[in-house]
Amino acid sequence: MIVSGGEALVDLVPAESTVDLLAPRLGGGPYNVALASARLGVPTAFLSRISTDRFGDALVERLEASNVDTSLLQRGPEPTTLAVVALDENSSARYSFYTEGTADRLVTDPGPLPGHTTALSLGTLGMVLEPGASAYEAVLRRESERGVLTALDPNIRADMITDAVAYRARFASWLPYVRLLKLSMDDAEWLAEGAGVLEAAKGWLDAGVEAVVLTKGGDGLSVVTADGEVASAPTVPVDVVDTIGAGDTVQAALLAWLVQQDTQRPSDLEPADWGQALGYAARAAAITVSRSGAEPPTADELAQFL
């Protein structure tokens, strides 16, 4: 089972009609990862704290509709986090967050995850906003030490990071507990702080990460291991509606592929294996960006695509 931990929120996206300025869409990076991996046919649970308000109920209902295990969810009366989305001329999304006193940042450490957990995915605001970030950090360290395939997508929201130096140091402290690091080129450059991305990736690998997957927007994605940049996959051409949830779909698809291959160690993969994994993730992300909001594909949709 894959466990995805982190925030669940409501994206307020530009509406298609001229009557409404913004339309609500259920989302949040880790939430999207849980939906995507479950839709791809892999048993998945979501770890978070979700509001008991109407938005929160809708978030839970959508998880259940996609067969996501909700037994690790915590519920609380605090409001749901909101993210106001702006789309640029390339349909790429920028976010403004409303997080003060919201439910997801108040998650507590659930203790050891179920014994049948094989993979753990963390990232985005869940690893930034306290006190929840410390809870997720404890889960990461504990599950890594018991052999779970751990994956991190920092999904940097720079305006939510009050101390960049402290965050980069904290990020470095996670790396010995992370087997798969997936991040966009923008995030990699922000974390590298002036160094070249491949040079930074080598440092992350030296710290304990087994594979670094870099997403490059229209230029596809690639993977860097101890042997260098060993494989890549091009972007699948589609009519892009927006990019919301694209990176989350990549994260979920990579983990789903690894779990389906019964692979716990990314370092065991050959370049040809990585080519298959990256291609699978690229196809899944292409379907997501062809639809409004974060709507990742089902396994059947992916099988029929192209």
Name every feature range the model reports, one short phrase each.
Residues E7, S48-T52, N155:
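Cofactor-binding loop segments of dinucleotide-utilizing enzymes, especially the Rossmann-like FAD-
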Residues T81, T102, T124-M127, A285, ...:
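Glycine-rich phosphate/pyrophosphate-binding beta-alpha loops
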Residues M1-S17:
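Positively charged, low-complexity intrinsically disordered leader regions
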Residues T18-A83, L87-S92, T99-D104, G111:
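Substrate-binding N-lobe of the ribokinase-like
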Residues V3, R141-R142, E193-L306:
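Conserved phosphate-binding/catalytic region of the ribokinase-like
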Residues A8, L12, P154-I156, M185, ...:
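Generic detector of well-ordered alpha-helical packing
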Residues M1-V3, R62-E64, T70-S71, S92-V230, ...:
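Ribokinase/PfkB-type carbohydrate-kinase core domain
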